[in-house]
Amino acid sequence: MTSLTVIDDLKQTLRFTQNALKRKAAYNPSEQFNEIQIETVSVCNRSCDFCPNSVLAPPAARMSPILLQKIATELADMDYAGKIGLYLRNEPFMDKSLNDHVRLFKKFCPKSFIYIASDGDLVTVEKLQKIFEAGIS
């Protein structure tokens, strides 16, 4: 009886492995993730208690346009249609090129939902109009 159990276990393992290989063969990179957040600048105008920046703020930095273009191109190559958040632990309106970034991702990933999250301190009606014209979702 023990040898039958071992054989049954081996058959089950083989079926499991075959199914896993079939899933891997049908793998679509665009299904790997459905949301990405990109921090284009590392600065924020606040120091919220719940944010890691309140304890250890990163040095002020800006993502290079070359890297941003590379990310947009790679997402386009995947036919990415998920969410793109142009913020992480920063205030997106502190990025003077924010509207350009929105246009870039709208061009390369037209099916994506492009969004930001802001504390609102720097928002004006004019800035809102411009970011919507740029293509923010």
List the predicted regions and their residue ranges:
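Conserved alpha-helical substructure of the radical SAM core
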Residues: T2-S137
